[in-house]
Amino acid sequence: MLEGEAYLEDCLRIDAFGKLDVIPAGRVPETHLELLASPEFSELVDLLKSRYDRVVIDLAPVQAVSDAIVVGKHADSAIYVIKSDSTPLPVVRRGIDRLQEVGINVAGAVISQVDLNKISSYGGDY
């Protein structure tokens, strides 16, 4: 879509309940970072913000590539996702600091892939 090969309406996928629209990444070109930094991407984000209550962009880890830094500048806020039992606290702190250093508002964090057997005593009857 950012390369001019498709229209937004052609890329949208709607869930079975009609409550969630998704734009899959599709083919990721070698120049994907240039596309994410392009005026076309900025215009796409602005268009999506005008059409939807929430726009969520799922990106690679901030430590791995610069995608989150480039795209995060278009976001009102970021949610930092931490893989349970995998991501050391110093790495989490560096990642959050890196986002904040470039002016990205980190609204919070989510811990993913939690092994509920390890925390069976927590939460009671939830």
Each predicted region: which residue ranges?
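P-loop NTP-binding module
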Residues: 1-126
